[in-house]
Amino acid sequence: MNQQDIKQKVLDVLDHHKVGSLATVQKGKPHSRYMTFFHDGLTIYTPTSKETHKAEEIENNPNVHILLGYDCEGFGDAYVEVAGKAKINNSAELKDKIWSSKLERWFDGKDDPNLVILEIEPEDIRLMNAGEKTPVSLEL
């Protein structure tokens, strides 16, 4: 599979799967939780509160890992493993772009001062279970 095909399959996974796990580093150990993800190209975003452990963990260590793509069965589903650096983005424009009424459960609107967006810039993306016998990496 060539790099363009790998990139397209990675983007397909990102387009069709919004819930995955985000791992941060807490006291030198992985700390994972489910999150909702959005993307623009290969840059991945997820909303959170600035008052969460994950925001504090990212301030202390920006290294993160994302798993995204499994469907219900979990056998043979294409998914991606993304290792990258996260930063807290407080852009009103970005909040407007990803705001959804589904977030009202946690926030008092897109102008809630606790709402921040985690912006993840991938450093390594591996495509898994996409018809290959072994994982394939997207060159970044």
Swiss-Prot record:
What is the native source organism of this protein?
A: Bacillus subtilis (strain 168)
Name the keywords, alphabetized.
Stress response
Q: What induces it?
A: By heat shock, salt stress, oxidative stress, glucose limitation and oxygen limitation.
Q: Protein name, please?
A: General stress protein 26
Q: Which domain of life is it from?
A: Bacteria
Q: Which InterPro entries match?
A: Pyridox_Oxase_N (IPR011576), Split_barrel_FMN-bd (IPR012349), Stress-Dev_Protein (IPR052917)
Q: Which Pfam families match?
A: PNPOx_N
Q: Which gene encodes it?
A: ydaG
